[in-house]
Amino acid sequence: MPPSFEAVLWLALPLTELGTRDAIRTQAEAICQGGFQFRGEPLQVGLTMQAFPEGFGLYLNRKGELEAVGQDINQRRTLIVMMGHRNLSVLCFDGGSLRAAGSNSNGPGFWPMFEKAARSAGVTQPDYGFLMAAIASNQSQQLSVARGRLFDFSEPMTACLDTYWQAVLTYWQDQVMPQLEAVNTEVIISGGASSILRSRLSAYFTELGLSQRVLFTEVSPRRLEALVRGLPESAQIPSMTLRMADSYGLFRGLIGTLDSVAV
């Protein structure tokens, strides 16, 4: 490694924290100006940093897919829906630009809905992990710490899914549905919690006649799948590839801007 080099950093920030990007950049540049020590050798780093909203990597992924078949993403409206454990976010891109008026990150997250429903169903905190495993695997028979035996979590599973679904449905109808007035609008659904409601979402969009305009980011690039398989956490977190799709798209976008690095 040379004693002095340039580093390019693309950072994904939650939509509500995007306003802090200048402060983050200033602080990061100040840290780099002070230099580093690596194995006793001084290192000087020149940092170039850009911040993007979480979900922009998914947009770049779709942009690349369309370009591969001769289509231009700028000719359509693209809604990126990210269903996370903390919240649900929507990014609206119109003509290739982020439209702030159609974007927000105040939708319901899976975890708050899960906790609410689990408590109402009589599940205590020591069993939260096993209830989560039941939902993720669709296998209701799981170990219960509170009961000291195998337990059928069918009723709590249904309660959690119903509670989350109703919250997502309300948000969709209030925040996303009005943006579908343009016939060239495409919706891309991702996030670690999206797989939990996959069947319900598919049935809902089919009923509305929207199935051809809604895409699920279930098929990931082979390189990403290979990368995730090498991580020890992947066995315990089946949705890890789905969770990493956004950051991987951002990484590929960054690599594509660097002439000196082979894509």
Model-derived regions: residue spans:
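Short C-terminal domain-edge/linker segments immediately following a structured domain
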Residues: 39-44, 82-83, 110-113, 121-123, ...
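Short acidic-hydrophobic surface loop/beta-edge motif
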Residues: 36, 104, 142-145
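C-terminal amphipathic alpha-helical segment
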Residues: 115-177
